[in-house]
UniProtKB/Swiss-Prot annotation:
<dbReference type="InterPro" id="IPR041711">
    <property type="entry name" value="Met-tRNA-FMT_N"/>
</dbReference>
<dbReference type="GO" id="GO:0004479">
    <property type="term" value="F:methionyl-tRNA formyltransferase activity"/>
</dbReference>
<dbReference type="InterPro" id="IPR005794">
    <property type="entry name" value="Fmt"/>
</dbReference>
<comment type="function">
    <text>Attaches a formyl group to the free amino group of methionyl-tRNA(fMet). The formyl group appears to play a dual role in the initiator identity of N-formylmethionyl-tRNA by promoting its recognition by IF2 and preventing the misappropriation of this tRNA by the elongation apparatus.</text>
</comment>
<dbReference type="InterPro" id="IPR002376">
    <property type="entry name" value="Formyl_transf_N"/>
</dbReference>
<dbReference type="InterPro" id="IPR037022">
    <property type="entry name" value="Formyl_trans_C_sf"/>
</dbReference>
<feature type="binding site">
    <location>
        <begin position="113"/>
        <end position="116"/>
    </location>
    <ligand>
        <name>(6S)-5,6,7,8-tetrahydrofolate</name>
    </ligand>
</feature>
<protein>
    <recommendedName>
        <fullName>Methionyl-tRNA formyltransferase</fullName>
        <ecNumber>2.1.2.9</ecNumber>
    </recommendedName>
</protein>
<keyword id="KW-0808">Transferase</keyword>
<dbReference type="GO" id="GO:0005829">
    <property type="term" value="C:cytosol"/>
</dbReference>
<comment type="similarity">
    <text>Belongs to the Fmt family.</text>
</comment>
<dbReference type="InterPro" id="IPR044135">
    <property type="entry name" value="Met-tRNA-FMT_C"/>
</dbReference>
<keyword id="KW-0648">Protein biosynthesis</keyword>
<dbReference type="InterPro" id="IPR005793">
    <property type="entry name" value="Formyl_trans_C"/>
</dbReference>
<dbReference type="InterPro" id="IPR011034">
    <property type="entry name" value="Formyl_transferase-like_C_sf"/>
</dbReference>
<dbReference type="InterPro" id="IPR036477">
    <property type="entry name" value="Formyl_transf_N_sf"/>
</dbReference>
<dbReference type="InterPro" id="IPR001555">
    <property type="entry name" value="GART_AS"/>
</dbReference>
Length: 315
């Protein structure tokens, strides 16, 4: 068993809560938890705590919710806990240099990619969209840059042809805690071997936008099929029909020449609505009109066949 460490945990969403849960079941002592302030959510816009806050309070841990760690008073909250290390997982706030240097072993971060590939806010979605064959998690020593610190530990997993960002998120949420506990053991025992990132291999995973999720029919069918999986469950790929946004949950590639302008419906069957793209045909198999639940192409054709007349050009 490795030496027990005094840990500050900083994180916000469910992905982070799964890492906190692993720490709470370990030999280490979580001395305080930092998470984002409660946010309005739902139709009533009621203030809701983060998943990390809910878990921390269930274990009677001290919870801190500053909107920034730049003020010295907020930095003092970190210093006063006397931690050996700070573990950061999808926290959402920038840690100033002073905070990074406060714990004896500094601050480490669990990142959802195999660095230096996909530094940034949306590594899971970008790796899927790019057609990567594998991804994973990297535990790194944090510095003042964006995901630029030395790498301490990596675990990888394959990306399958069926993966969505939702399924990949779940895979990495299983790998992350394993890698985190292994890294903490190495740091506690003095056996960690930091590895500098190769700057020649860097690529960036910019934050996603809803407008970016609008289907661009000039892309190839293969690119669009990956995009649909990458943007599921958020922000969801979408197209516009009759002035209404329609989300696309699932599609497949038909490797045939379309012989039509990109965006043209070439066939509408119960198996899927076939649309010409920049290269090949994309078959839309599960769609969700505004205000409705997701449904099969067959069910949508039964109610809205006029939307999908072959020869119609989608925006």
């Amino acid at each position: 068993m490795s030496q027990s460490l005094r840990i500050i945990f900083a994180g916000t969403p469910d992905f982070a809560a799964r890492h906190l849960d692993a720490l709470l079941s370990s030999e280490h002592q979580v001395v305080g938890v930092f998470t984002q302030p409660d946010r309005p959510a739902g139709r009533g816009k009621k203030l809701m705590p983060s998943p990390v806050k809910v878990l921390a309070e269930a274990h009677n841990l001290p919870v801190f919710q500053p909107s920034s760690l730049r003020p010295q008073d907020n930095q003092r909250l970190v210093a006063d806990l006397g931690a050996d290390i700070m573990v950061v997982v999808a926290y959402g706030l920038i840690l100033p240099k002073a905070v990074l240097e406060m714990p004896r072993l500094g601050c480490i971060n669990v990142h959802g990619s195999l660095l230096p590939r996909w530094r940034g806010a949306a590594p899971i979605q970008r790796s899927l969209w790019a057609g990567d064959s594998e991804t994973g998690v990297t535990i790194m020593q944090m510095d003042v840059g964006l995901d630029t610190g030395d790498m301490l530990y990596k675990l990888s997993c394959p990306i399958t042809a069926e993966d969505t960002s939702g399924s990949l998120y779940d895979k990495l949420a299983e790998l992350g805690p394993q890698g985190l506990l292994a890294t903490l053991a190495q740091l506690a025992n003095g056996t960690a071997r930091p590895e500098v990132q190769d700057e020649s291999l860097v690529c960036h995973a910019e934050k996603l936008s809803k407008e970016e999720a609008r289907i661009d029919w000039s892309l190839s069918a293969a690119q669009l099929e990956r995009c649909i999986r990458a943007f599921n469950p958020w922000p969801m790929s979408w197209l516009e029909i009759d002035g209404q946004p329609v989300k696309v949950w699932r599609a497949s590639v038909i490797a045939e020449a379309a012989h039509a302008e990109p965006g043209t419906i070439v066939a509408a069957t119960k198996q899927g609505i076939q649309v010409a793209t920049g290269d090949g045909i994309l078959s839309l198999e599960s769609l969700q009109p505004a205000g409705k639940k997701a449904m099969s192409a067959q069910d949508l054709l039964n109610s809205r066949r006029e939307w999908f007349i072959p020869g119609t050009r989608l925006a």
